[in-house]
Amino acid sequence: MKEGIHPDYREVLFIDMSNDFKFVTRSTIQTRETAEFNGKTYPLAKIEVSSESHPFYTGQQKIMDTAGRVEKFNKKFGARASGKAAK
């Protein structure tokens, strides 16, 4: 294989920010942060949803609004959606 053209494939620590679930897998993701897990330091990737928190895998229904999309929509269109037409 040619040198210098392939991404760095290494073990990376992923943390599910919704429930602090941690797992290590191999990935080419580029990160600046590191964290210690089971006595070893890994590059750190923070994720919003994993199999431990996704409703499909957990069987629980919940609204996943980590970016505040619902509040942003209600702020922008709330008056129109509730029947109060702003003119």
From Swiss-Prot:
Entry keyword annotation includes Ribonucleoprotein: yes
Name listed for the protein in its UniProt record: Large ribosomal subunit protein bL31B
UniProt similarity note: Belongs to the bacterial ribosomal protein bL31 family. Type B subfamily.
GO cellular component, one term: ribosome
Subunit structure: Part of the 50S ribosomal subunit.
Membrane-spanning segments: none
Keyword ATP-binding carried by entry: no
Gene Ontology MF terms: structural constituent of ribosome
Listed NCBIfam families: L31, PRK01678.1
Classification via Pfam families: Ribosomal_L31
Annotated GO biological process: translation
Keywords: Ribonucleoprotein, Ribosomal protein
Gene designation: rpmE2
InterPro entries: Ribosomal_bL28/bL31-like_sf, Ribosomal_bL31, Ribosomal_bL31_B, Ribosomal_bL31_sf
Stored PROSITE patterns: RIBOSOMAL_L31
